[in-house]
């Protein structure tokens, strides 16, 4: 359009020179409007941007023989994702449920510790460390479906999700965002990136970035209130000679008063579950219930480009977190639905530290005239966690009226003390070696292979002063996992691929928090393997793009917790999952775009006995068969864009024998974006427009409800 405007200007200028005297006539040219034609985040799939999660070789999604999805910064903002929990629900086939006790992510038929959640590629081996935080501090979220232990270590048979934090860039950034919404939600966020030294030549140039965010309010359960803050800052230094260094620090703080843990279901709790509408917002936690977390990250990243063919990167990292809990966490209605029985009063502290160093290299070479790229490295980490659990008396139970009640102060509970007493300590030391290669067998046929070997040492020790015989358990694990994938570019617009990958998972969940009994019962990690076939293509004159994959995953020797008592463990011999994932992006017209994804999985136990009963053929609890997402945007004018989205989740089983379930649900969202200028944008969103009552997690006697109708506005100013 700009070239057309210049041509039109030239033609009209020539005409004016021919028809008028230069000394006496001046002609005013018509105004030419130039509109921003950036790709809409809800349109075509962005498959040609390099990612760091599907491979360490810097491949794009289109080049990777695996299912890879990237939710970038622009997409996060366009869809109004306020937290990392919101972002996860945009990934294909992903279902999440988040309370402060645990963040349960389900993908490809597996959940919990079978889904690796890593931060800038760093695996903390602890799912509670993945509490949802505001999305402002993240540049993007990347996901690879299926086994990925060969990239990020033990875990990840179902998927790996990688949160990439904002860091300093080589260009100026100045932005402020203010938000307000229902239930007194408030947000204030700020971002700044500047060169503070040097002339931009790459010799002794230094860039600093700081991003801050503060949120308050927005909670929907009665008497639940809280606030959170995040600060991310980094210094990027170009020191010359191909050497750069980035020093990054991150701080997170959150306090949630009287947090919500769930809602009791109507009794009898058999078959289809339901919740009485009048109990939707009830909060049965203690009057002074609390969740608090303080998290700090420090990373030192040195990159050295030795030549066009060889580069080396070293990352030193430190993580320190403290999480405090004082809550009554479980509730059940009695058989007449006239009182709520409250149990599981827990005072807890998690003191978690991780330190490590990772050095890896990338080499571009040839083998017999064929391009061959290599990535190889060493990762060493030291993971320490001390827990401070104190329970109320074993027989403690409180009964209250479902509608009119006053709950106690937590420290008034029988047997409860007001100090944190260390009870358990976990130490996990890990030394890993990894290697990855991509070789061009022909100009259109590429072979991708990967291998990782780990030397893991786990040490559990009891610190409980009341124990007469101290518990002490040690295990060593030496898993080797890998991937082999083949990608065939059948045309410039389409490719097909096949891959086989393996994984090694902790049998009973997270290595940094597993119970002593589980350590004794499991002398090896569980094994998993996957076969996947897929295709990625552009079509319709590059106005459409799509991906499709089918997979078969099998995992052996699993330990799972009893849904009625998390301290009771059952052993599962084998669990399988077969499924299909698809993504579609369309630019229907210059103003109208659409994007959708769907995940279907048939997950079932193959070998599982509980109390002498075979549960073979049953679906694991809280694993939906189908998850579908849809977004569409329409630009009414260059300044105003409307959008809508919908999410459908099929039934969630609440126990292992599939006798209770929460039914399928669909929620719809709407929003708009208005650009007052290229630097000022007003956005508005309404989630769950119909105010649908739905659950994101099902348990035998209670469910975790999803958010009711929620609306908010944000103003973002760039300067």
Predicted regions and their residues:
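Acidic, small-polar-rich N-terminal luminal/periplasmic segments of exported/outer-membrane proteins
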Residues: 29-172, 533, 700
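Transmembrane beta-barrel wall of Gram-negative outer-membrane proteins
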Residues: 173-175, 180-260, 290-306, 452
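Repeated loop/turn-to-beta-strand initiation elements of outer-membrane beta-barrel proteins
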Residues: 200-201, 205-208, 242-245, 309-312, ...
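Structural signature of Gram-negative outer-membrane beta-barrels, strongest in the C-terminal barrel
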Residues: 238, 352, 371-373, 379-383, ...
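Face-selective signature of the C-terminal outer-membrane beta-barrel domain
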Residues: 296-320, 343-463
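Gram-negative outer-membrane beta-barrel transporters
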Residues: 444, 552-554, 571-656, 690-693, ...
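C-terminal beta-signal and adjacent terminal beta-strands/loops
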Residues: 648-655, 673-719
């Amino acid at each position: 359009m700009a070239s057309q405007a210049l041509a039109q200007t030239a033609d009209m200028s020539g005409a004016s020179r021919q028809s008028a005297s230069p000394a006496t006539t001046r002609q005013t040219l018509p105004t030419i409007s130039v509109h921003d034609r950036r790709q809409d985040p809800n349109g075509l799939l962005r498959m040609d941007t390099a990612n760091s999660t599907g491979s360490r070789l810097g491949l794009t999604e289109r080049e990777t023989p695996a299912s890879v999805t990237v939710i970038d910064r622009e997409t996060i903002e366009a869809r109004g994702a306020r937290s990392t929990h919101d972002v996860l629900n945009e990934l294909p086939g992903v279902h999440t449920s988040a309370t402060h006790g645990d963040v349960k992510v389900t993908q490809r038929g597996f959940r919990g510790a079978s889904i690796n959640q890593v931060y800038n590629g760093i695996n903390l081996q602890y799912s509670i460390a993945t509490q949802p935080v505001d999305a402002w501090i993240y540049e993007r979220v990347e996901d690879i479906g299926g086994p990925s232990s060969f990239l990020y270590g033990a875990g990840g048979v179902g998927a790996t999700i990688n949160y990439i934090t904002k860091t300093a860039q080589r260009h100026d950034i100045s932005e402020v965002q203010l938000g307000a919404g229902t239930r007194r939600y408030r947000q204030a966020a700020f971002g700044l990136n500047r060169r503070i030294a040097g002339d931009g030549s790459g010799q002794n140039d230094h860039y600093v970035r700081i991003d801050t965010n503060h949120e308050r309010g927005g909670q929907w359960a009665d008497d639940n209130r809280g606030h959170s803050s995040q600060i991310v800052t980094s210094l990027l230094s170009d020191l010359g000679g191909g050497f750069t260094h980035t020093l990054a620090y991150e701080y997170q703080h959150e306090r949630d008063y009287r947090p919500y843990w769930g809602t009791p279901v109507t009794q009898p709790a058999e078959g289809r579950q339901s919740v009485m509408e009048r109990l939707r917002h009830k909060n049965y936690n203690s009057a002074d219930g609390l969740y608090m977390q303080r998290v700090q990250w420090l990373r030192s990243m040195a990159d050295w480009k030795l030549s066009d063919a060889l580069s080396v990167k070293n990352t030193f990292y430190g993580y320190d977190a403290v999480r405090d809990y004082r809550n009554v966490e479980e509730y059940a209605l009695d058989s007449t639905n006239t009182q709520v029985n409250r149990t599981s009063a827990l005072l807890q502290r998690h003191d978690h530290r991780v330190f490590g160093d990772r050095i890896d290299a990338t080499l571009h070479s040839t083998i017999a005239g064929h391009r061959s790229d290599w990535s190889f490295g060493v990762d060493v980490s030291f993971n320490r966690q001390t827990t401070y659990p104190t329970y109320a008396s074993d027989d403690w139970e409180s009964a209250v009226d479902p509608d009119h009640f006053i709950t106690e102060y937590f420290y008034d509970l029988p047997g409860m003390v007001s100090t944190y007493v260390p009870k358990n300590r976990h130490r996990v030391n890990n030394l890993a070696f990894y290697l990855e290669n991509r070789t061009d067998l022909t100009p259109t046929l590429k072979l991708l292979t990967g291998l990782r070997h780990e030397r893991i040492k786990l040490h559990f020790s009891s610190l409980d002063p009341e124990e007469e015989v101290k518990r002490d358990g040690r295990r060593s694990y030496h898993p080797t996992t890998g991937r082999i994938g083949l990608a065939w570019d059948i045309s410039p617009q389409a490719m097909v691929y096949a891959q086989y990958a393996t994984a090694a998972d902790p049998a009973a969940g997270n290595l940094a928090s597993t119970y002593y009994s589980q350590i004794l019962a499991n002398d090896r990690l569980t094994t998993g393997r996957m076969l996947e076939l897929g295709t990625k293509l552009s079509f319709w004159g590059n106005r459409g793009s799509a991906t499709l994959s089918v997979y078969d995953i099998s995992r052996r020797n699993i330990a799972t917790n009893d849904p009625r008592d998390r301290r009771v463990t059952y052993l599962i011999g084998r669990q399988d999952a077969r499924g299909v994932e698809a993504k579609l992006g369309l630019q229907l017209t210059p103003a109208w775009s659409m994007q959708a994804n769907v995940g279907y999985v048939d997950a079932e136990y193959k070998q599982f006995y509980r109390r002498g009963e075979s549960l073979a053929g049953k679906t694991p609890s809280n694993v939906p068969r189908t998850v579908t997402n849809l977004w569409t945007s329409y630009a009414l004018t260059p300044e105003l864009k409307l959008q809508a989205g919908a999410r459908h989740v099929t039934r969630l089983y609440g126990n292992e024998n599939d006798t209770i379930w929460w039914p399928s649900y669909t929620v719809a969202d709407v929003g708009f974006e208005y650009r007052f200028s290229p630097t000022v944008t007003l956005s508005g969103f309404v989630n769950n427009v119909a105010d649908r009552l739905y659950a994101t997690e099902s348990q035998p006697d209670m469910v975790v409800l999803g958010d009711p109708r929620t609306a908010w506005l944000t103003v973002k100013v760039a300067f």
